[in-house]
Structure formats: structure tokens, C-alpha cells
Amino acid sequence: MPDPYAWLQNSLLTIHRADWYRSVQTIQGRAGASVVLGGKEVINFASNDYLGLAGDERLIAAAVAATQEFGTGSTGSRLLSGHRELHGELEKAIASWKQTEDALVFSSGYLANIGAIAALVGKRDLILSDQYNHSSLKNGAILSGATVREYSHCEVGELKTQLLEQRQNYRRCLILTDSVFSMDGDLCPLPALLDLAEQFSCMLLVDEAHATGVMGKTGAGCVEHFGCTGRQLIQIGTLSKALGSLGGYVAGSHPLIDYLRNRAPSWIYTTGLSPADTAAALAAINIAQQEPQHRMQLWHNVNYLRELLQKIPNLKLLPSASPILCFQLSSPSEALQVGKQLKQAGIFAPAIRPPTVPTSRIRISLMATHKPAHIEKLVAVLADIS
């Protein structure tokens, strides 16, 4: 009989030949603007720790205190033994920050997306999704069983055409979009999407993963940034990027959150977020709101790097309005080579390749804790390489 697992090795060979093979790179020591990678200190431009809070002593102290009081794990699902007072405090803090009626905390942003989407739509419904949406949105759409159609990236006109042609054929319609697109750094046209959602009686779900703590006057996200606070939509985000912890959330109306508590499988059938992660996220939200200087420093760094990168000839910098800056390369092999050269020069900014993105690139993530010397070294190395 043939080996039913033989195809695995063949598939790995195909991945290698296409220069798509991936492996982990072990980071040593505490999270920060500089980390130790393979025994060598490098400047970290690969992290989503935008405000530099993952290594903040106050988050660490909050996590330690919660662990000492409650133990290491939540021990059960939130509907059984896994709900702590801390969870409720965190959900109230998120709802207050986002200016929504309520919020619900999940064990990760990925689980928040797939759980919410699966709960909101089904076989009689339509999902319209931006083609560059995060994998969690795309997989949630597939798992829901709804009819899924993609529209070209940020093309509101095409989305409207699809709504005109298809909306009347379905019970419900859910529009899905990232607010900050994680592999490009650009923003969705949120006000126009909200207008279409209202015009065609659609739900709109916006993933604020890379906007939470970063965008808007108080860091509440792109909904705040675009002046759309108070408009009817579903906001999802993560606690693991600018907030330096772990977990995800959904924020919205009381009926929405109450419904998800009863119908979102990835919330109902999994262990609640650990006390340590919950306490750290709560501390991070307080810091993000009370200490805007971290966000101001982040944006100063973003603007400084963009200004310097624009002076490098032949660098194909992609449009961005966030702390994510990418420059495009011709092939996966070139991206791998540039990533290797950067690493040899003490810069950690790995290659991003298909199928994660349509075209290969180097992705640079800025942090509030980057110093001018870090940014200047990155630019000098890129100028030499290009």
C-alpha cells in the first residue's frame, strides 16, 4: 500500500523550489527595539510592538500580580469556570476606549475574526471581502459557509457594483476589511465603506489589529482616525500588537456582543484569556490613553524614516499611512537575499513572500522605542544594498 503521508515531502520540495519555505527564527531576551537573534544583537524592524509596551515594566508587573492572585491559567471556557473579574474590567476598558456599548475579549485576534464571522452569517448570506484582507478574515469567511466574493483592494466603485448586482439575492450581507492592511501599510476607505453598508443594508466588520493603539487622537483606531465613532459597525482587534499582550476583541452594540457570547464558537468552546495576558492588556490600554507621548514618538519615527527612504534611488516604496513601510522587490529570491544582507548588517527586517503577499517585499515595522540612530543605520544599509 502507498504511504498516505508521502505527499508531505513532495509538497515541501515544491515549497523549497519556489523560495516559499519558512522557518522560525529564535529571538532571545526581552522584546524591544534591539533583540538578540542567532547570538547577534540586531535592530528589530520586524515587530508589531508599535508602542514598545511588550517590555514595559508596568505590563510585566501587572502580569506577575495577576498570576500570583489568580494562577497561570483561566482553567476553563468563559461560560464555565474561566471568567474572572479581570476579563470584565478589560472588556469595559475596550468599550470605553472605542466608545461602543460593549466588548468581548477572545483568546486571540484570529479567534475573534473567525468566531464573529461564523456567528454572523451562514449559507443564505453574502460576504464581500477586500482581496488583501488578513488570512483570519478570509478563513472566517470560508468557515461561515456564506457565499464569498472578493473586491479589488480598496476599490469602492467595484464593491458598489457587486452590491447592486448581488445584494438582493441574499438574506444578510457582511462587508469585511482590515483598517490598516498589515502587509502594505495603507488604510481602508472606511467612511465610503460605511456609506455603502448603510445604503445596501449590510453589516460592516473592520479589523483594527494594526490600528489599535496607533491610529486616532487617543489611539482607539481607524474608526476614530476617520471620525466614524458612533456609526454602526463591528470593530475587531488584537491585544498583541501595540498593546504588547495577547488576545483579541470585538467591540460594538449590546445586542451584538450578547449574541456573540451565545453563538461565537471560538469564544464559547475555548479557554478564557489567561489572567496574566488580561492584566497586561488592561495596563497597556491605560498607558496608551494616559501617555500619548508613546504614540507621538512612534509617528515621529514613521515620518523620519519615510523622509529618508524617499531619498534612496530605485527603492520601490509602497504607499503607506501607518507604521508599516514596505518596499517591493522583483522575486522571492531577491527578497530573501536582501533580508539576508540586512541581517548580516545587524538589521532584522525579514522578507515577505507569496503566498502571504502577491509580490515579494521587505516589511519594516516602526516602534516608538526606535532611536534616530536605529533608523539612520537602516537607511544607510538599504542605500548600500540598492
Swiss-Prot record:
Keyword Transferase set for record: yes
Tell me the residue numbers annotated for binding substrate.
R22, H134, T356
Q: Mark the residues carrying the PTM N6-(pyridoxal phosphate)lysine.
A: K241
Name the InterPro entries for this protein. Aminotrans_II_pyridoxalP_BS, Aminotransferase_I/II_large, AON_synthase_class-II, AONS_Archaea/Proteobacteria, PyrdxlP-dep_Trfase, PyrdxlP-dep_Trfase_major, PyrdxlP-dep_Trfase_small
Q: Which reactions does this protein catalyse?
A: 6-carboxyhexanoyl-[ACP] + L-alanine + H(+) = (8S)-8-amino-7-oxononanoate + holo-[ACP] + CO2
Q: What is its EC number?
A: 2.3.1.47
Task: Name the enzyme's class.
Answer: transferase
Which controlled-vocabulary keywords does the entry list?
A: Biotin biosynthesis, Pyridoxal phosphate, Transferase
Give the CDD domains listed for this entry. Answer: KBL_like
Q: Enumerate the residues binding pyridoxal 5'-phosphate.
A: G109, Y110, S182, D207, E208, A209, H210, T238, L239, S240, K241
The record's listing under PROSITE patterns reads: AA_TRANSFER_CLASS_2
Q: How does it assemble?
A: Homodimer.
Q: Which family does it belong to?
A: Belongs to the class-II pyridoxal-phosphate-dependent aminotransferase family. BioF subfamily.
Function, please? Catalyzes the decarboxylative condensation of pimeloyl-[acyl-carrier protein] and L-alanine to produce 8-amino-7-oxononanoate (AON), [acyl-carrier protein], and carbon dioxide.
Its protein name is Putative 8-amino-7-oxononanoate synthase
- Which organism does this sequence originate in? Trichormus variabilis (strain ATCC 29413 / PCC 7937)
Gene, per the UniProt record: bioF
